[in-house]
Amino acid sequence: MSLSGIITALVTPFDRDGAFDRDAWIRLLDLQLAGGVQGVVIAGSTGEAATLTDAEYDEMLCSAVVRVGGRVPVLAGTGLSGTAKTISQTKRAADNGAGYALVVTPPYIRPNQGGLKAHYLAVADQGGLPVVLYNVPSRTGCDLLPETVADLAGHPNIVGIKEACASRERVQALLALRRPGFTVFSGDDSSAARSMLDGADGLVSVASNVLPSAYRHLCDLARAGERGAIDLWNARLSDFHAFCGLDSNPIPIKALLQRIGIGYGLRLPLLPLSVCHHDIADHLADQVAALEALSSRKIVAA
């Protein structure tokens, strides 16, 4: 199953006691499928993967694979600081039914480009899943450069990249270097429309947790080259883009989800959204239902 369009980087919903909330998880998956998303990421950084137990990881992934039922691709976050552990986690994801591994650059270690290349080649050779590279230097402390991506893209088991740098020049460099069959995804909601107009294949989104249809429509417009319409639609989503950047991900998006009845809170060391932002969270949550209804009508009409 190929990758393109809108993919949601899912949160992990917890209950009031901080335990994994399976019921809320299933409702979140159903919301995404009903909203027309074209893929889901399980246990990435938005999913607070670093706080999950192995048992929770297995339960989330297995239940998602069953619930999705082959309708859209399921990507599992498997990137860890060490190569051997990343390979092991990728094998674990494969055993649980994932279709792809989303592999972030090793956090905190800060390998050079040669080390990053060797790391990804080892995971691609030994992990048992097609690999989507994930570059987010603001969180990991290292930057996977386009020339290194170009070298890695020649491996048959390395099939794409989620690029979270908002730089237009970075995305254009990746597009210029990619081979056929290698997909380039924006990992930044606010600049994704521009990236897709330039030729990127889709968006791995945070805000689509609450607005799956709205971000599906965003991707559809951008990939169709509808520049006038995309500017207007992106402007409607701009407050959500800005809100999701008010604090560390996934603090803001989980505040919105809680307001629409999915999950409670985060796990330490993350704390809930500051009280000073509650009014804007309430205001945006009040807009979700109407915006999703409008988006659904536009998707059907298209």
Swiss-Prot record:
GO annotation (BP), single: lysine biosynthetic process via diaminopimelate
EC number: 4.3.3.7
Entry keywords, A to Z: Amino-acid biosynthesis, Cytoplasm, Diaminopimelate biosynthesis, Lyase, Lysine biosynthesis, Schiff base
Broad enzyme group: lyase
A molecular-function term among this protein's GO annotations: 4-hydroxy-tetrahydrodipicolinate synthase activity
Pfam family of the protein (one): DHDPS
Main location: cytoplasm
Sites annotated Part of a proton relay during catalysis: S45, Y108
Pathway this chain belongs to: Amino-acid biosynthesis; L-lysine biosynthesis via DAP pathway; (S)-tetrahydrodipicolinate from L-aspartate: step 3/4
Subcellular location: Cytoplasm
SMART domains linked to this entry: DHDPS (SM01130)
Residues annotated as transmembrane: none
InterPro entries (UniProt xref): Aldolase_TIM, DapA, DapA-like, Schiff_base-form_aldolases_AS, Schiff_base-form_aldolases_CS
Catalytic residue list: Y134, K162
Residues that coordinate or bind pyruvate: T46, V204
Catalytic activity: L-aspartate 4-semialdehyde + pyruvate = (2S,4S)-4-hydroxy-2,3,4,5-tetrahydrodipicolinate + H2O + H(+)
HAMAP family the record matches: DapA (MF_00418)
Family: Belongs to the DapA family.
Function field: Catalyzes the condensation of (S)-aspartate-beta-semialdehyde [(S)-ASA] and pyruvate to 4-hydroxy-tetrahydrodipicolinate (HTPA).
Quaternary structure (record): Homotetramer; dimer of dimers.
Protein name: 4-hydroxy-tetrahydrodipicolinate synthase
Species name: Xylella fastidiosa (strain 9a5c)
Species lineage: Bacteria, Pseudomonadati, Pseudomonadota, Gammaproteobacteria, Lysobacterales
Protein encoded by which gene: dapA
